[in-house]
Amino acid sequence: MSNKKRSASSSRWLQEHFSDKYVIQAQKKGLRSRAWFKLDEIQQSDKLFKQGMTVVDLGAAPGGWSQYAVTQIGSKGRVIACDLLPMDPIVGVDFLQGDFRDELVLKALLERVGDKKVQVVMCDMAPNMSGTPAVDIPKSMYLVELALDMCRDVLAPGGSFLVKVFQGDGFDEYLREIRSLFTKVKIRKPDASRARSREVYIVATGRKL
């Protein structure tokens, strides 16, 4: 891609981003990101969070989902968050900075979870996008497979899994895998998710024994 085309594409993205009503609302409300609104819509329909829950947030930065989750689980709840990028502190959130794909980071994350199972695992991870689906989709599927592995390790029976997935090769197989592990599975496209984006959110509840 030429610099001219890249510049035009970047300019369009910036214009779209800063005119987005959810970006504007997030700024007015002092929220970390527009992702807050996606999770709020999902919570209204699927009721994932309750007071006192422990939640794992993968791909947490800049903190939109963690920020929302703590409002739902209260002072007795706990969010354990992880991201490759730094994240400013949030009261009620135990944040670990590191690459989730790294064995040492995963070990540290599991140590923070401890022996008790968690009630929700949520994953908003995405790779650095090249704009080429044949490259981006496999990278994304690898990340969400790791997140599902995390569910197998730490999610309590009856627990819930929320994951952002980009539709493409491997999506149907991944969905079948999730359905084998949970009693109820829904696909959501929140209003705050841009229409042209391939992203959808799989909401899986009732982790099977």
UniProtKB/Swiss-Prot annotation:
Catalysis performed (reactions): uridine(2552) in 23S rRNA + S-adenosyl-L-methionine = 2'-O-methyluridine(2552) in 23S rRNA + S-adenosyl-L-homocysteine + H(+)
> What's a single GO MF annotation on this record?
rRNA (uridine-2'-O-)-methyltransferase activity
Query: What is a single Pfam family found in this protein's UniProt entry?
Result: FtsJ
EC number(s) of the enzyme? 2.1.1.166
- Please list the coiled coil stretches: none
Q: Where in the cell is it found?
A: Cytoplasm
Swiss-Prot/TrEMBL keywords? Cytoplasm, Methyltransferase, rRNA processing, S-adenosyl-L-methionine, Transferase
GO annotation, cellular component aspect: cytoplasm
Q: Where is the active site?
A: K164 (proton acceptor)
Describe the family membership recorded for this protein in Swiss-Prot or TrEMBL: Belongs to the class I-like SAM-binding methyltransferase superfamily. RNA methyltransferase RlmE family.
- Database matches in NCBIfam families: PRK11188.1, rrmJ
Q: What is this protein called?
A: Ribosomal RNA large subunit methyltransferase E
- The gene from which this protein is expressed is rlmE
